[in-house]
Each structure stands twice: as structure tokens, then as C-alpha cells.
Amino acid sequence: MKLVQVPVGFELELFASEPMIINPIAFAWDERGRLFVIETTDYPNEIRKEGGDDKIKILEDTDGDGKADKVTVFAEGLNIPTSIMAVNGGMLISMAPDFVFLKDTDGDDVADVQEVVMTGWGKFDTHAGPSNLKYGFDNKIWGVLGYSGFDGEVSGKKFNFSQGVYRFTPTWENMEFLGRTSNNTWGLGFSEDFETFISTANGQHSVYLAMETKYAKRTVYKGTPNTATG
């Protein structure tokens, strides 16, 4: 914390630490001001076909002192979840090869709904999977992806892409691949004017997404050396 720089007028304070939470990889706040944190001990090497040792914990400040004093295990038995966001009254997580929707319906703060809403995310390198799920100002869900790629079907349409930024609706439909970056893409952020910035873990600390890829493509016709068709 000593090396973290914050804007003038802001202070950095510790909210939670071990043993309450270990190895946090991503977090999201819900509408009640509770912090949902992905805790992973499987990342990056323990790839499992079923089950796992990773969890999502709810951290709460119940006495208003700015520090977490209550922890609840929202979901467990997970394997390398890499992103989390609040949506549709629950939490959406990226956990390659799936995106999974988790929801508590009986008020005990434990997810009793666990639904795979999208599948096809690559897992051959856990460092380069899907991450940074968040709402855009267009009320669509945005995310980024590394070279592990996506090869799946959304809304009856086949997609195959990697290393870039994508978005889809909160009903898990209408996937759009918006633009490419490079290799190990993990960062995604928006300015106040909804300008989009992406970063990778190596080589590209900040990339500006000026426009969607579809607007930069040239028309290509059958019979040209290029195999694409316009």
C-alpha cells in the first residue's frame, strides 16, 4: 500500500486482509454496498474438469468503520474464476470454459442458482482467458480476452476470436467482438465520455479503442487473393 499513488485529496485505507481473504483476483460491489471477492488458490496451475478450491466471499462492514468485519462464503467449489460483476440480481463470473450466473434466491447469502449462460472460452493458458467483466455506458456487458480465445455460439451465431474486447447484452445475447489487442489482455476501463481503454499484462500498458473493428475493415470480394468475402 505504501507504493500506491492516489489523487490529491484521497486516502488509501485497508478494508480487508488475510486470513479473512486470501489470493483475491477480482471483486464487485452489489447494490447494498457489499464486496464480492473471488478468492483463488487454483490459479494458475490447478485446472480441473470438475469442482475446485476457489470461492466467492461476501465482505461486509457492519459497524460503519470502513473495515470488513463479516465474511460469508457466497459460492465455493469453483475453478479459476477470473472476473465478477453484479447483474440481474446476482453475480456473473468468467470461469473458462464457461460464464456462470450465480444468485441467492432465499436470502441466506449463499448462491443457490448456478447457471452456465455461455460456453466456449479457452483455458489452455489460464493467464490469457476472459476477464474484466463490467457494464458499459450502453448498458451492455463488456469484457476482454487473451490468446486463449473464444470458440462458441451465442444467439445462434458462431464466434471465434481472441486477444481483444467484446460485449453482449445482460440477457447473454448479441455477442460483438469489437477490436483486437495482443496476447495477455487483462485491463478494461472507460472515461467519463465512454472512451474505451484496454491494457495487456505485457507490452501494452494502455491501448485506446478508437472504433470498432468492423468500421476499419475494407471490402473484400470473392476472387481476390484474400479468402474473406464482402
Regions found by a protein language model. Give the residues of each.
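Beta-propeller domains with acidic blade repeats across secreted/periplasmic ectodomains
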Residues: 1-230
